[in-house]
Amino acid sequence: MRALAALLLLTSVAEAEPVTLRMAAIAPDGTEWARSIKAFARDVESVSKGELKVKWYLGGIAGDEMVALERVKHGQLDGQAGASFCQRLAPSLRAARLGGLYQTREEVIYVMGRLKPVLDEEFRKSGFFNLGQAVFGADVLFSRQPIRTMEELRATRLWVWSLDPIWQQMAQEMGFHTIISSIEEHSPLWRKKSYDAFFTVPSVALAYQWSTETAYYSDFPATMLPACLVVSNAAFDPLPTELKQILQASAAKFMNRFNEISTQLDEALVNGLFEKQGLKRASVPPELRAEFYAAAKRARDKLGAALIAPALLSSVEKMLGEFRQQRREATKR
């Protein structure tokens, strides 16, 4: 009898329908991001031998990040990859978006790694399983004219993404004249000369072809843009343990690859590819750099808990101090 029950159980498992996770991202199809996303889906299906599949809706087909998030909550999608929505689900991730706090991509990756247990729990409480974090990159300045002083930057109309509340608050507190709109409205407003400059990640400017419409870029890291990959608890929890492990392992490979690709692409763009497109590289005077970071610190201090819990900011600053000290000691060896 036990043998018959075991046989029936095995037959039931063998005949089980493959599970398909419906995922969304606003990454335009044909970009390096989209290719990495599709490679992740292929890896999941291959390793699971077809038992688990990931179907992606790219290029904003499922709506912007907030619309897609609502669709996940209503069961129309199972997960999402992106940037702005991540901070809504895991508020501590706002620490990675604070302007003027980080000098390199590696610093953000280090901090997010240290915060991962906290982030995992915040995602879980919001109804999601955290498959991983990554970094799109550092926002740099694109403009119609070269900007060499803080006074010139404050006098310039500056575009800010409507789904980026942390940078919106900081930019306004720093005295910038902000024009807020969606990504879809970015190019039409630029062509109408509704604004004259914007901060964004180099690979983002390339993906949305914004770099073909501007004239100058200045390479100094103003803010960092973190990313995440999540699946709803409702979709993740029922998965067999083996499929959960496969999904997590494939996601880890994807996030590592995402960081590598983003780093390589951004470095190539700011070190020559943009200039081949016709952009001119505007130098960043030390005074502008110093004044920008000083203004960013004043904004962080003044906004306080409106941006991030003071205790979390203090903890992150301590982490950064430790990381930078480790790097200094390593260079002396």
For every predicted segment, state its role.
Residues R2-A3, L313:
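Short amphipathic alpha-helical segments that mediate assembly, nucleic-acid/protein binding
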Residues A3-V13:
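Sec-dependent N-terminal signal peptides
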Residues E17-E107, F123-R333:
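N-terminal secretory/targeting leader peptides
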Residues V111-G127:
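Hinge/lid segment of periplasmic solute-binding proteins
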